[in-house]
Amino acid sequence: MDNNNACVLVDGHSAELKLRSSTIGPNVLGIGSLYEQTKMFTYDPGFTSTASCESSITFIDGDEGVLLHRGYPIEQLAEHGDFLEVCYLLLYGELPTAAQKKDFDYRVVHHTMVHEQMSRFFTGFRRDAHPMAVMCGCVGALSAFYHDSTDITDPHQRMVASLRMIAKMPTLAAMAYKYHIGQPFVYPKNDLDYASNFLRMCFAVPCEEYVVNPVLARAMDRIFILHADHEQNASTSTVRLAGSSGANPFACIAAGIACLWGPAHGGANERALNMLTEIGTVDRIPEYIARAKDKNDPFRLMGFGHRVYKNYDPRAKIMQKTAHEVLGELGIKDDPLLDIAIELERIALTDDYFIEKKLYPNVDFYSGITLKALGFPTTMFTVLFALARTVGWIAQWNEMIEDPDQRIGRPRQLYTGAPLREYVPLSKR
């Protein structure tokens, strides 16, 4: 047997499986030939121990609380970079030079307008429709307007589609918000940066001048960076799976948005904010801590723990700082929700129960407070998540298209239904 392979014994028969090495993190065992050698599949619900692809975009070390994009720590990117710089990094693999950054920013900014006919899509929805429902429909419909960039075999068309989606998502998200609250749409302005443009499209009204607060714009930009990509999560895997069939990029991103809408994925910050509201005051925290520890109580602390992180989510530290900056800039000194959040965090980092179960604050814990302070209703939280994550989805989709090992996704199953049986005519049943 090759020293780079592993031997698996199944019912007295051996199977030789190839070991594949990672740059950092766990190596993987290639099981593609397992069925051929043993006539057996592996069983791993939720992909707990299964790598579905090879990727060079994002790395997470959940035990150490590390998040890297193309090798760069998220802390450094959020502190020193801006969102479009991170977009360039995710798409192309390297940080841009000054000239590359200027050119990339220009190309994104000049794709922010959407076809005027798109406005008719919004009028077809009820005003009280959830903005995520609207986003699913409108993003999927982009392929009907921009069918000159849907040939996935053409690298140029793929890149044009990538830029279009990164550029148009803020416009569509702002339109969804404006339609939801009954205000007129606001067109983008090419002389504003990405985050400032988005805030203006959301909060400007025709009857008065709107000046973007640079502190709030920087906070919005940082929130986008923190949500740009997060490895092979549910929505990213959905985008890859849809893309493996050859679906156009707009359809793939719409599929990702639909998956992100699930409360276990993109809706966590909304649930965390609702939990803080339910607790109400700091003096009620012990009551809810006791409930969280009670196995028979359905109450769960939202914003704590993570499927991957078994340490402090590095994004949570940055989000906490951002929350303080936003509240300070807006003069919100005695926000009860922030007081509750800070005390809950203190308890979680010192209480043996939370430490033993590795329940540390995650990025959703502070993001809800921050977005609420910026003026967004809870129904928009997941929309903002989708807006930011679009670049990650696109980068992962492009990588999947270019990977020669990838083919259409076709998971196997453990069948537990009825064995072969004969059809019985209706008259004899």
Curated annotation (Swiss-Prot):
The UniProt record lists the EC number as 2.3.3.16
The family database entries (InterPro entries) matched by this protein are listed as: Citrate_synth-like_lrg_a-sub, Citrate_synth-like_sm_a-sub, Citrate_synthase, Citrate_synthase_AS, Citrate_synthase_bac-typ, Citrate_synthase_sf, Citrate_synthase_typ-I
Write out the GO cellular component annotations: cytoplasm
Write out the catalytic residues in the record: 306, 364
The GO molecular function terms of this record are: citrate (Si)-synthase activity
Please name the top-level EC class of this enzyme: transferase
Record keywords, A-Z: Plasmid, Transferase, Tricarboxylic acid cycle
User: What disulfide bonds does the UniProt entry report for this chain?
Assistant: none
Record flagged with keyword Cell inner membrane: no
Gene Ontology process terms (BP): tricarboxylic acid cycle
Report the CDD domains cross-referenced here.
Answer: EcCS_like
Reaction catalysed by this enzyme:
oxaloacetate + acetyl-CoA + H2O = citrate + CoA + H(+)
Question: In which pathway is this protein known to take part?
Answer: Carbohydrate metabolism; tricarboxylic acid cycle; isocitrate from oxaloacetate: step 1/2
The organism's superkingdom is given as Bacteria
Q: Tell me the NCBIfam families matching this sequence.
A: cit_synth_I (TIGR01798), PRK05614.1 (NF004126)
Q: What does this protein do?
A: The exact function of the plasmid-encoded citrate synthase is not clear, it could help nodulation by allowing the bacteria to use citrate as a chelator of iron and calcium.
Q: Which PANTHER family match?
A: CITRATE SYNTHASE
What is stated as this protein's family in its record? Belongs to the citrate synthase family.
Q: What is this protein called?
A: Citrate synthase, plasmid
